Amino acid sequence: MITLLSTWTFGLALALVALGVFVSYRLFSFPDITTDGSFTLGAVVAAVLLTAGCDPILATLGGMAAGGLAGCTTALLHAFFGVERLLAGILVTTALASVNLVVLGRSNVPLSGTTTLLDQAEAGIGPVFERTGLSSALAGEAARLAFVLGVVGLAIALLWTFFRTQLGTAMRAGGDTPTMARALGRNTGGMTLAGLAIANGLTALSGALVAQYQGFADVQMGIGMVVWGMASVFLGAALVGPVRLGGGLVATAAGSVTFRLLVAAALRAGLDPDWLKAATAVVVLAALVAPRFLTRGSHARTH
């Protein structure tokens, strides 16, 4: 039972990465490779602040802000210096590999002896679950799950609210049709900057939470996060089909949890962990290709 709850918690923490990819890719049509670097940056900054005795909330927000700055850098390279989108993300991610190592000071920093947000959640919410008859270990994991679920729910609510405002709607329109937005006098560069700041801030928040959940930060922990995010977005879309903004956000989070459950099941079935990244790529490919075959099949049946 603890393993299942842990899988849910980890999947929800990574759902913030998926939401970031949803914002950059779905809403702004921006294939942002910065995700890998900003995830690690959020974890690294939060870990350094925590080990320095900083308040867990401030440390987590600091990691989130650092990720937002990374997204701004990618947007600046593209929108104001004319660097192609993929190349801008690659350049920033490459630079962040050095930045993360310098900030962390070494390749891995344990968080033992520090008080994290999840420790506080366990201390505050855990007794509530214990009163239902759960063991202390199970109640602690349930408390961590409830906390991360609350963070993801709040993120979805804030994104849904913001992108339905006049400014948010204009940003979405600029992402869909930038040429028309420029013709209407919209500052598409500023919109891209804000969008990538939000996307990478969410990704860095995920990194900060994952580091606190795992109990350490590592300079390699962000490798493959952009693929995880894409897999979650496409898997969520495959699960629910075409939906509006709110449904898309919820489906993306559900896709992350579902994907984490699939990964856990595959590992328990004997999948070599060395093949995990390759399996992730296959899932993304399947989610991309399957709808086309289903569409062809439906057309064939109707003709």
Residue ranges and their predicted role:
Residues 55, 70, 140-218:
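Helix-loop-helix "hairpin" substructures at the membrane interface of multi-pass membrane proteins
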Residues 200-278:
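Transmembrane alpha-helical segments in multi-pass inner-membrane proteins
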Residues 3-61, 76-82, 234-246, 266, ...:
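Single transmembrane alpha-helix segments in multi-pass membrane proteins
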Residues 158, 176-190, 243-247, 262-303:
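Cytosolic-side transmembrane-helix boundaries in multi-pass membrane proteins
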